[in-house]
Amino acid sequence: MANIKSAKKRAIQSEKRRKHNASRRSMVRTFIKKVYAAISSGDKKAAETAFAQMQPIIDRHACKGLIHKNKAARHKSNLTAQINAMSEDSLLKKRRSEGCEFKAPEKPV
């Protein structure tokens, strides 16, 4: 433990900030996990709702420096891609179950 009064104060402040940041970081991780859980369950509407709740929180904490801005962007990008892929997969499954074969349009050469 520090002997100087200002060093003691800084140690107390540092510990207080560490605990606060740990709880905020945990909250961000929880919101991200909720989106992944909704995606894995296959419920697109729940995934979109969870993503809409997660996005402003992850942006806010990236601006404040709690997580890196590139990490926030990476999570948003990956989750958006997975949510968008859910609709394509469900469309293919629906058409196959109806007996229709879905073919992507051919690109002109």
Swiss-Prot record:
GO (cellular component) term, any one? small ribosomal subunit
Region labeled Disordered — which residues? 1-26
Per its UniProt record, what Pfam families does this chain match?
Ribosomal_S20p (PF01649)
**GO MF annotations, alphabetized:** small ribosomal subunit rRNA binding; structural constituent of ribosome
Protein's GO biological process: translation
Keywords, sorted A to Z? Ribonucleoprotein, Ribosomal protein, RNA-binding, rRNA-binding
The question of whether RNA-binding is a record keyword is answered with yes
- The highest taxon in the source lineage is Bacteria
Q: Show the InterPro entries listed in the entry.
A: Ribosomal_bS20, Ribosomal_bS20_sf
The UniProt entry, under PANTHER family, shows: 30S RIBOSOMAL PROTEIN S20, SMALL RIBOSOMAL SUBUNIT PROTEIN BS20C
**NCBIfam families for this protein:** S20
Reported function: Binds directly to 16S ribosomal RNA.
Name the protein family.
Answer: Belongs to the bacterial ribosomal protein bS20 family.
What is this protein's name?
Small ribosomal subunit protein bS20
